[in-house]
UniProtKB/Swiss-Prot annotation:
Source organism of the structure: Burkholderia vietnamiensis (strain G4 / LMG 22486)
InterPro entries: Eno_Rdtase_FAD-bd_dom, Enoyl-CoA_Rdtase_cat_dom, FabV-like_NADH_b, Trans-2-enoyl-CoA_reductase
A Gene Ontology molecular function term of the record: enoyl-[acyl-carrier-protein] reductase (NADH) activity
Disulfide bonds: none
UniProt-listed Gene3D superfamilies: NAD(P)-binding Rossmann-like Domain (3.40.50.720)
Protein name from the UniProt record: Enoyl-[acyl-carrier-protein] reductase [NADH]
Active site: Y235
Site keyed Plays an important role in discriminating NADH against NADPH: positions: E75
């Protein structure tokens, strides 16, 4: 079939398998052209491995460090008549290129929050890899069925303690509008912490450690975003921020557990990028459109692959890690450059419907958004007939 982008709200409901493959190849080429990660990981588990930062971590480990990788994700395959999810096509492409390089790459499709998927992952590590020396936790999910209670909990994006009114960008209508969000209830805050906080990360590490599949010296990291003053009311000081602060609490006991065997656990702070998750946050499209303009003019703009490759090479496995007073690894320092933030703040209130394209890089934002789904990739013929039914050989599909 011939597949064109169809966008509804903050989701593109179509995906392009050839475009997704080309996007993965671009990321692989970035890593191979920037050289190996010295003393990098060799057997890696990525939880949330199919898109965004998790996919970038899988690519960086495999093609920057020659690592065997096991990826866990929740995606949907395509059929003859309907495209699958972008994450499915990304993972199919990754496995294809890894196999060409002689690297082990296997994937598990299912609910990473469940005990069942954790057990299947452990069994697969025992059978195929023995032990893993790096665990990357990169899950973004709107809800979680708690494995111990069976309760399905939802996360909420709201301020805490007060209602907040801010400028937003309606990406469908391409208009600037005021958005008011009411404060989260305590139940909503608790739910967000349960879905987006550190409990599941801790459950994963406990399960892997108890099963004896963590190598001596194993490291783990969970990805987070902090942002700066302009996004704090809705992000760091909001319900999502409460979940992110929970990561900072949980990492302490995870670090203590791994340190016994010479390992380490860190929260890694990454910059704001266009992802399916960030496009759902009301103020992020405007913030990102301004940030891209400023950072591109400065020559410091980065996407997922630049961020994660740099994080692994410089901070997780390098001699001079960027680390803050909380013990977090920082890859967001170019975004938080005071000059960059000052320029974003100065332009924030000046953007109007009429000057949106001149004042911001909304055009770049839209391109990045479509690239998530395999569109707007250079060299891809979008008028060609493509087969949306792409197989992932050897996948362990717990959803089938």
């Amino acid at each position: 079939m011939i597949i064109k982008p169809r966008v509804r709200g903050f989701i593109c409901v179509t995906t392009h398998p050839v475009g997704c493959e080309a996007n993965v190849k671009e990321q692989i080429d970035y890593v191979t052209s920037h050289g190996p990660i010295a003393n990098g990981p060799k057997k890696v588990l990525v939880i949330g491995a199919s898109t965004g930062y998790g996919l970038a971590a899988r690519i960086s480990a495999a093609f920057g460090s020659g690592a065997d990788t096991l990826g866990v994700f929740f995606e949907r395959a395509g059929s003859d008549t309907k495209p699958g999810t972008a994450g499915w096509y990304n993972s199919a492409a990754f496995e294809k290129f890894a196999a060409e390089k002689g690297l082990y790459a296997r994937s598990i499709n299912g609910d990473a929050f469940s005990d069942k998927v954790k057990q299947i992952t452990i069994d697969t590590i025992k059978q195929d890899l023995g032990k893993v020396d790096l665990v990357v936790y990169s899950l973004a999910a709107p809800r979680r069925t708690h494995p111990k209670t069976g309760e399905t909990i939802s996360s909420t994006l709201k301020p805490v303690g007060k209602s907040v009114t801010f400028r937003g960008l309606d990406t469908d209508k391409e208009t600037i509008r005021e958005v008011t969000l009411e404060p989260a209830t305590q139940e909503e805050i608790d739910g967000t912490v349960a879905v987006m906080g550190g409990e599941d990360w801790q459950m994963w590490i406990d399960a892997l450690a108890d099963a004896g599949v963590l190598a001596d010296g194993a490291k783990t990291t969970a990805f987070t975003y902090l942002g700066e003053q302009i996004t704090h009311d809705i992000y760091w000081n909001g319900s999502i921020g409460e979940a992110k602060k929970d990561l900072d609490k949980k990492v302490v006991s995870i670090r203590e557990k791994l340190a016994v065997h010479g390992g380490d656990a860190r929260v890694s702070v990454l910059k704001a990028v266009v992802t399916q998750a960030s496009s759902a946050i009301p103020m992020m499209p405007l913030y990102l459109s301004l940030l891209f303009k400023v950072m591109k003019e400065k020559g410091t703009h980065e996407g997922c692959i630049e961020q994660v490759y740099g994080l692994l090479k410089d901070s997780m496995y390098g001699a001079t890690p960027h680390i803050d007073e909380e013990g977090r690894l920082r890859a967001d320092y170019k975004e938080l450059d005071p000059q960059v933030q000052a320029q974003v703040v100065a332009m924030w209130d000046k953007v109007t419907n009429d000057n949106l394209y001149e004042m911001t890089d909304f055009a770049g934002y839209k391109t990045e958004f479509l690239r998530l789904f395999g569109f707007e990739i250079a060299g891809v013929d979008y008028d060609a007939d493509v087969n949306p039914d792409v197989k992932i050989p050897g996948i362990i599909d717990t959803t089938a």
